[in-house]
Amino acid sequence: MANSASSRKRARQAVKRNKHNSQIRAKVRTFIKKVTYALEAGNKEQAQNCFTIMQKMLDQAVNKGLIHKNQAARKKSRLNSQIKAL
């Protein structure tokens, strides 16, 4: 339990940041799923549209330190190659 005023404040900030970061990670995962579902349905145009939005969200998550840059690059590369294969 936080005892000093500064440690209580840091605990509040950590909870707030954790909630915000969780929301961003959830949005990224949602758009990855949207691209995957569009690929499974064979809808190349929808997959491409969702992919461009997903790229932006992944890059933002990388800049905020939520996702490692290599993980984001790997996801983008694999999904893009699947879109091209359609």
Swiss-Prot record:
Protein name in UniProt: Small ribosomal subunit protein bS20
The species this protein was found in: Vesicomyosocius okutanii subsp. Calyptogena okutanii (strain HA)
Residues covered by region (Disordered): 1-25
GO molecular function, one term: small ribosomal subunit rRNA binding
NCBIfam families: S20 (TIGR00029)
Highest taxon in the source lineage: Bacteria
GO cellular component, as recorded: cytosol; small ribosomal subunit
A Pfam match: Ribosomal_S20p
Family: Belongs to the bacterial ribosomal protein bS20 family.
